Curated annotation (Swiss-Prot):
Additional record remark: Heme 1 (or BL or b562) is low-potential and absorbs at about 562 nm, and heme 2 (or BH or b566) is high-potential and absorbs at about 566 nm.
Subcellular location: Mitochondrion inner membrane
Protein task: Component of the ubiquinol-cytochrome c reductase complex (complex III or cytochrome b-c1 complex) that is part of the mitochondrial respiratory chain. The b-c1 complex mediates electron transfer from ubiquinol to cytochrome c. Contributes to the generation of a proton gradient across the mitochondrial membrane that is then used for ATP synthesis.
Protein name per Swiss-Prot or TrEMBL: Cytochrome b
The species this protein was found in: Eliurus webbi
Residues holding a ubiquinone: 201
Residues binding heme b b562, per UniProt: 83, 182
Necessary cofactors: heme b
Length: 380
């Protein structure tokens, strides 16, 4: 008799995705972050659901309702900080996941990669709207500044901004719709994740060597389920330590002041995970140019499969491109630091140089390095 997990219509899908899935035998711990992102998403939906039970999306009561959650709801403080810091964990895993894809050439599975870019945009949109909900100073001014960027769009910009605001400024209508979108988007993300996995399982997973691994596959369970559980335990250890010992470490003190449209904070900045893009936005003096650079900073990832010049997929055997890759990582860390600094000398020029370097490495230096390496290895 066939095992039920192989014959039942529903269990069969789970079996082919997480149990009997043929997986390359040599994938390293860098491949753990896909499952960690799944755990983060489940955690965010669960904690978010409980927060939504007590939160009110009204400008007069939003800030008080968050305070009420922290003070009066049983373990409300824990749920709130798990949700806030869970977002940080989500982005750490996301950046590593994308970075691993870039390093090992996983972007050559174009459908999976493009789906991942759509997911990245969706998660960033969700996180931005979530940051607005507590209705602190940084929530209000962050929402005002970022939504205002759309006014740079020629002809329809101003109308578009007022349409998104639901009025002539960020107000009750804006907060209500942001809450509605923040609630629905994670469920859309779950659907997108399923499509992402569908595309992934069409071609199978890549591996560190970048070579075809059809001849050397092992079942996902028990080998990689155990490996993933270890990753999950380490992630939870890190998250719980952060929540219990330094819950406000990654937050902004300004967000503990209720939103006041008449008082602008000295430094308006987003959460740490958006600082690199914010630095690129600020480094261009022109408003429309800045907005385009901001969008392109993520969208440039979609060009990677078309900019791949080497005959080798992975960077494992490509020292020149490896060096460029780590310079790019250092450059992104520099941009993250600059995004949190005031707009003054020397931060302006550092931000501009780091922004130029970011695009130059991806669009010019990496493709050139690929060709040089092929030449040196006599692979052309």
């Amino acid at each position: 008799m066939t095992n039920i997990r192989k014959s039942h219509p529903l269990l069969k899908i789970i079996n082919h995705s997480f149990i009997d899935l043929p997986t390359p035998s040599n994938i390293s711990s860098w491949w753990n972050f896909g499952s960690l992102l799944g755990i983060c998403l489940i955690l965010q939906i669960a904690t978010g659901l409980f927060l939504a039970m007590h939160y009110t999306s009204d400008t007069t009561t939003a800030f008080s309702s968050v305070t009420h959650i922290c003070r009066d709801v049983n373990y409300g403080w824990l749920i709130r900080y798990l949700h806030a810091n869970g977002a940080s964990m989500f982005f750490i895993c996301l950046f590593i996941h994308v970075g691993r894809g870039m390093y090992y050439g996983s972007y050559m599975s174009i459908e999976t990669w493009n789906m991942g870019i759509i997911l990245l945009f969706a998660v960033m949109a969700t996180a931005f709207m979530g940051y607005v909900l507590p209705w602190g100073q940084m929530s209000f001014w962050g929402a005002t500044v970022i939504t205002n960027l759309l006014s740079a769009i020629p002809y329809i910009g101003t109308t578009l901004v007022e349409w998104i605001w639901g009025g002539f400024s960020v107000d009750k209508a804006t907060l209500t719709r942001f809450f509605a979108f923040h609630f629905i988007l994670p469920f859309i993300i779950v659907a997108l994740v399923m499509v992402h996995l569908l595309f992934l399982h069409e071609s199978g997973s890549n591996n560190p060597s970048g070579l075809n691994s059809d001849a050397d596959k092992i079942p996902f369970h028990p080998y990689y389920t155990i490996k993933d559980i270890l990753g999950v335990l380490l992630l939870l250890l890190f998250l719980i330590s952060l929540v219990l010992f330094a819950p406000d470490l990654l937050g902004d003190p300004d967000n503990y002041t209720p939103a006041n449209p008449l008082n602008t904070p000295p430094h308006i900045k987003p959460e740490w995970y958006f600082l690199f893009a914010y630095a690129i936005l600020r480094s261009i003096p022109n408003k429309l140019g800045g907005v385009l650079a901001l969008i392109l900073s993520i969208l440039v990832l979609a060009l990677l499969p078309h900019l791949h010049t080497s005959k080798l997929q992975s960077l494992m055997f490509r020292p020149l491109t490896q060096a460029l890759y780590w310079i790019l990582v250092a450059d992104l860390l520099t941009l993250t630091w600059i995004g949190g600094q005031p707009v003054e000398y020397p931060f302006i020029i550092i931000g501009q140089l780091a922004s130029i370097l970011y695009f130059a490495i991806i669009l010019i230096f990496m493709p050139m390095a690929g060709m040089i390496e092929d030449n040196m290895l006599k692979m052309n």
